[in-house]
Amino acid sequence: MYTNSHDIIRKPVITEKSMAEMADKKYTFIVDPHANKVQIKKAIEEVFGVKVEKVNTSNILGKTKRVGVHVGKRADYKKAIVKLTEDSKAIEFFEGMQ
């Protein structure tokens, strides 16, 4: 279904909460909604060259927004919180952000 690992990982989540979790080697990403935990784990290990201990996922429903009489909806997305093993190195992309 996926041609490569970059199709699964969409973008990192940079928030105050996700930055605090980086001390525990937990990194948060927006991922493809159809990807499962095994595919996400394989993609993170392949792209960043780290060892993943576990993956927690959650489907986030987009909020309903309105401007005047027009009603719209933000897109739904899937969020993955990836915990690395103790002996694994940190993901270089996030270094210097703490």
UniProtKB/Swiss-Prot annotation:
User: Record keywords: Lipid metabolism included?
Assistant: no
Which keywords annotate this record? Answer: Ribonucleoprotein, Ribosomal protein, RNA-binding, rRNA-binding
Q: Which GO terms of type biological process are on file?
A: translation
Record Pfam families: Ribosomal_L23
Q: Which GO terms describe its cellular component?
A: ribonucleoprotein complex; ribosome
UniProt subunit comment: Part of the 50S ribosomal subunit. Contacts protein L29, and trigger factor when it is bound to the ribosome.
UniProt family annotation = Belongs to the universal ribosomal protein uL23 family.
What is this protein's name? Large ribosomal subunit protein uL23
**Species whose genome carries this gene:** Clostridium acetobutylicum (strain ATCC 824 / DSM 792 / JCM 1419 / IAM 19013 / LMG 5710 / NBRC 13948 / NRRL B-527 / VKM B-1787 / 2291 / W)
